């Protein structure tokens, strides 16, 4: 008998970190909640990271996910921005890990491929597929939508991993 697994997807960012919660049972996906955690750009970096930490900790505490998935970051030409994004990503991985959750990581192209079928796509395609896959989905902004896509990517990968284990066993 399968159990419902609750997944939190996290799209890390220093200004806005998106989060999305889904429940999965077999191949079935159900939207639970989504949103963003923001940091105050007028504050110093350490304070902003604390804001992200505290906001994500509230989400994890409130929704009690079983597993977490975080999008990997890419390196861009602005080294300072890349480092700051990496620090925000560290917070995005730390919070669920400290709550005892297994944290998986996915490249942006893998997330898009899992949701829209190709590794390169537009935001509106992700939004459309979220509405098809989970008709009751609600999200405000790209960050929350991306976080839901990350959670879906993890749900699909969990299914593939279970299939491989069953065939090998």
From Swiss-Prot:
InterPro entries: RNaseH-like_sf (IPR012337), RNaseH_sf (IPR036397), X-over_junc_endoDNase_Mg_BS (IPR020563), X-over_junc_endoDNase_RuvC (IPR002176). It is found in: Cytoplasm. Its cofactor is Mg(2+). Mg(2+) 1 binds at residues 11, 143. Mg(2+) 2 binds at residue 71. It catalyses: Endonucleolytic cleavage at a junction such as a reciprocal single-stranded crossover between two homologous DNA duplexes (Holliday junction). PANTHER family: CROSSOVER JUNCTION ENDODEOXYRIBONUCLEASE RUVC. The RuvA-RuvB-RuvC complex processes Holliday junction (HJ) DNA during genetic recombination and DNA repair. Endonuclease that resolves HJ intermediates. Cleaves cruciform DNA by making single-stranded nicks across the HJ at symmetrical positions within the homologous arms, yielding a 5'-phosphate and a 3'-hydroxyl group; requires a central core of homology in the junction. The consensus cleavage sequence is 5'-(A/T)TT(C/G)-3'. Cleavage occurs on the 3'-side of the TT dinucleotide at the point of strand exchange. This is Crossover junction endodeoxyribonuclease RuvC. It comes from Rhizobium etli (strain CIAT 652). The gene is ruvC.
